[in-house]
Amino acid sequence: MASTKAPGPGEKHHSIDAQLRQLVPGKVSEDDKLIEYDALLVDRFLNILQDLHGPSLREFVQECYEVSADYEGKGDTTKLGELGAKLTGLAPADAILVASSILHMLNLANLAEEVQIAHRRRNSKLKKGGFADEGSATTESDIEETLKRLVSEVGKSPEEVFEALKNQTVDLVFTAHPTQSARRSLLQKNARIRNCLTQLNAKDITDDDKQELDEALQREIQAAFRTDEIRRAQPTPQAEMRYGMSYIHETVWKGVPKFLRRVDTALKNIGINERLPYNVSLIRFSSWMGGDRDGNPRVTPEVTRDVCLLARMMAANLYIDQIEELMFELSMWRCNDELRVRAEELHSSSGSKVTKYYIEFWKQIPPNEPYRVILGHVRDKLYNTRERARHLLASGVSEISAESSFTSIEEFLEPLELCYKSLCDCGDKAIADGSLLDLLRQVFTFGLSLVKLDIRQESERHTDVIDAITTHLGIGSYREWPEDKRQEWLLSELRGKRPLLPPDLPQTDEIADVIGAFHVLAELPPDSFGPYIISMATAPSDVLAVELLQRECGVRQPLPVVPLFERLADLQSAPASVERLFSVDWYMDRIKGKQQVMVGYSDSGKDAGRLSAAWQLYRAQEEMAQVAKRYGVKLTLFHGRGGTVGRGGGPTHLAILSQPPDTINGSIRVTVQGEVIEFCFGEEHLCFQTLQRFTAATLEHGMHPPVSPKPEWRKLMDEMAVVATEEYRSVVVKEARFVEYFRSATPETEYGRMNIGSRPAKRRPGGGITTLRAIPWIFSWTQTRFHLPVWLGVGAAFKFAIDKDVRNFQVLKEMYNEWPFFRVTLDLLEMVFAKGDPGIAGLYDELLVAEELKPFGKQLRDKYVETQQLLLQIAGHKDILEGDPFLKQGLVLRNPYITTLNVFQAYTLKRIRDPNFKVTPQPPLSKEFADENKPAGLVKLNPASEYPPGLEDTLILTMKGIAAGMQNTG
C-alpha cells in the first residue's frame, strides 16, 4: 500500500491510482483486492482515452477527479465552484466526452467492486449481515447454513425443515419499471469486462493466458466506451419484455436446476436422504412486462397478446434444446412395460418419418431406443407449439392445430414422468436423477409460458366500463352509487346467468382497451397468466367488478384478483377492506381458501415518507394476516418493492427477515424491478445467490420468526409515525412553493429525456407531486444526493419521542438492538445518508433555485444533518457505516466520480434553464474534434435537441453516471 500522506502542492499525479491511494482506507480484509482491481481497469481506460483523444483530454479528466477527491476529503465547497468553472467552458463534443469518460470510469469502479465481492464469496470470508447495495451486497443467506442452523440452533427436526421447504413458494416478478438506465449493449460488454478481470486474477493463469486476457480486457473497455450510452428512442413494452426474458434465457434457465441440486445437497447434509420433489414450486417466475397497463397507454391488448405468444415461442425453443440433449443421454433399451407399449405405438404410427428440419435424430428412431422414441414425439409437439405461436404472432391464425401442440403443463409432463418412472423401475434411478430430473424441474418452474404474465390496471378504469354498461342499460350511473349498492348489483349479476355486455355498448378508446384486455385473457391459454392486480383499490366492489368483467368476456379460468394497497390511507383501511371482501359468501366460494394481496412501497413512501410508510406496511400486513386467519384463508402477500430504499429496496434477506411474524408462512411474491434485475440475475453466480437468499430467508422467517414488537415499542412507533407524516406533508404537500422548489433544485423536469422506460413519468399530465410517479420522484432526489423522501420526517419523529420523555432515547436504542424491523429500517437509512451529501444538494440550490427559496433549501439541509446525528446516536455509531467497512470503502472509491458528475449536471442544468448564464469557452481538448468549424460526430447523434449543441447529451450522461454511482435510479 502506498503512503497515505497528502500530496504536496506542486506534486502532479500521473495516474488516478496515485490519487486513489491517498483517499481509500487501508485493506479492509486480507482478501481485499478492490483498489488493485479498480486501478487495473481505470489505468487501461485512461490509456485508451489518450490513444483515441490525446493527452489533453486524459489530463483534464484526471484533474476533475482530483478536484472532486479534494472536496470529498476536506468538504471544501469552494472546490465545487472550481470544478464547475473547469467544466462549463468545454466545447460541446468535449463536454460529452468528459461526461462519458467519468461515467465509464464509474462503471469500471462498480465492476471492480462486483469482482471483489465475488472474490470474497469464493474465499468464504463474507461479512454476515452487512448493508451493502442489493446487487453487490456482501449480505448472505446461505441455504446450507440456514438448514443446519434451523436444526442445530432452533431445534427443528430435519423432517420438519424438509416439509417446510416442500410447502414453500417464492414467486419473483420481473417488472419493466423504468429504472434500468444502462443499455443492454453496455450491460453485456460490462459482463465480459467482469469475466476478463476475474480470469486475470485466477491462481493457475499462464503468461500466454494473461496476455490474451489483457488484450480482451482492453478491447471490451474500448468497445464499451465507443458505444453510445444514450437510448435514442423510448423502448416499447415488447422491447422491455425481450430485455427481461433475456435474463431467463441467459442465467435463470440453467440456474434454477443448479440451485435446486444445491438444495438437495443441503438436505442430504442434515440427514434427509431424498431429493426435493420436482413438482415442488420452490421458485416461480412471473412478469409485468406487457401486462402492466396502469398509467401506461402503450400497453394495449395487442401488446399483451404479443408478449404472451413470444414467451411461449421462447419457452418451446429452450425445451427443444433440452429434449435433444436428453435424447443423446437416454440411449438405454431397458424400460418398463408401460413405456415400451407407448414407444411401440408411437413408432408404428409415425411410419418412416423423416424430419429434415432437425439437425439431430432427423430419421425415424428405432423401437429398441424407447426413451428416444418418446422424447422424439415430445420434440415434435414442442416444434408445433413453437410454430403455432409464431404463426399466431405473425398473422393471428395458424394451420397447426392446438391438439398437435402442447396446451397444458400436465400434457407436457406426462411423457417425461413416464420416462422417469421407467428408469427408476429398471434400477436406473441415478440416470433419472440427472438431466431428466433437471428438465422436470424446469417444466414445473417455467411451464409452457416461461413466466406467468400478471395483468395490472387502475380501479377507476374498471369503474368506467361498468358505469358505461349501467348507463347504457338505463339503470343509473354505477360511478355515483354508494359502495353497498355497487356490491349488491355486482353480486346479483355474478350469481345470475344473463349476459350483461351489450354488443352495441358505446365505447371510448379507454373502455375498448379495458374490454380488449379481458378478451385477450379469454383467447390465450390460461397458463399464460398470473393474477389480475387492481391498483388504487379501496373497496370490495373494485375486486367484484373485475370478477364480473372476466365472466362477461368469456375468461374460462378466471384470474385470481389481487387488490393493491399503496397509499397511506389505503394501507390503513386495507385490513377492513379485506375483511369486507371475505364476508361476501360468493367471493369466499370463488377463492377456495386462497387470497393474494399486494402492498406497495413506492406510493406509500411518496405519500407519507419512508418511516411512516414502513410502519404502516408492517401493521397492515400483521392485521391482514390476522383477518385471513379468522376466515380460514391462506394469505400470500405480494411486495411491490423498488430498488431504492425510498421505494422499499434493500438487501433481500434482511427485508424478508424483518417482516412481521406469521405474514409469510412459506409463500411470498416480490417484484424485481429495473436495475435490480441486472444486479440479481446478470451473471450465473448472481442468479444462484439471489435464489439462495430468497429461499433461505423465507424458510427462516417461517421456522424461526422475528420477535414481535413489545407494546411500548408499538405505542412509540404509532406516535412517531404520526409526527413523521405531519412533518413530511407539512413540507411536501402544505408548503406553498415546494413543487416550484423541487422542480428547480432537481432534474425532475428533464427526467423524461432519458428514455429509460415505456411508461410516462406521470399518471396524468399537469398537477403536482401527487400525479408524479414514485420513480421520477425518488430518481430526482437521488440525482442530487439529497434523498429527501427517505429521511424527511424521521428526525422530527425521533426528536418528538426524546422530548416527550428522555427515557424514550433508551427505548429507541432497545428497539434498534432487539427488533429486526426497526434495525433494518434505521440501517437502510444510514446507508442512504452514507450516499448522501447536503453540500452537493446546496450547489444545486445555489445555481438553480430562486433567491427567495434558498432559505427554504437551507432549512431542509439543516434537518438532514440533524436527522443523521440523531440516527447515529440511536444506533450507537460514531461514524456513518462504521459497521460496514466494505461498503464504506466502495463509496470512498466511487464518490469523486459522482461528485464530478453532480457538478457537471448542476452547471449543465443552469445553462439549459438560464440563457443569460455566461461561460468562458475553452480550446478543444480532444484531438479528434480539434477543428472548431467542423461539427463533431458526437453532437450529431442528437440532432433534434431543443437545447444548444451537446447540452442534452451531457445532461443525460450525468444522470446515468449518478444512477450508476448510487447503484440505484428510482
Curated annotation (Swiss-Prot):
The modification Phosphoserine is found at S15. Its EC number is 4.1.1.31. It comes from the Eukaryota. The active site is at H177, K606, R647. It is found in: Cytoplasm. Its cofactor is Mg(2+). One of its GO terms (biological process) is leaf development. GO terms for molecular function: phosphoenolpyruvate carboxylase activity. GO terms for cellular component: cytosol. Pfam families: PEPcase. Pathway: Photosynthesis; C4 acid pathway. By light-reversible phosphorylation. Disulfide bonds: none annotated. Keywords: Allosteric enzyme, Carbon dioxide fixation, Cytoplasm, Lyase, Magnesium, Phosphoprotein, Photosynthesis. It catalyses: oxaloacetate + phosphate = phosphoenolpyruvate + hydrogencarbonate. Through the carboxylation of phosphoenolpyruvate (PEP) it forms oxaloacetate, a four-carbon dicarboxylic acid source for the tricarboxylic acid cycle. Homotetramer. Belongs to the PEPCase type 1 family. NCBIfam families: PRK00009.1. This is Phosphoenolpyruvate carboxylase 1. The lineage of its organism: Eukaryota, Viridiplantae, Streptophyta, Embryophyta, Tracheophyta. The gene is PEP1.
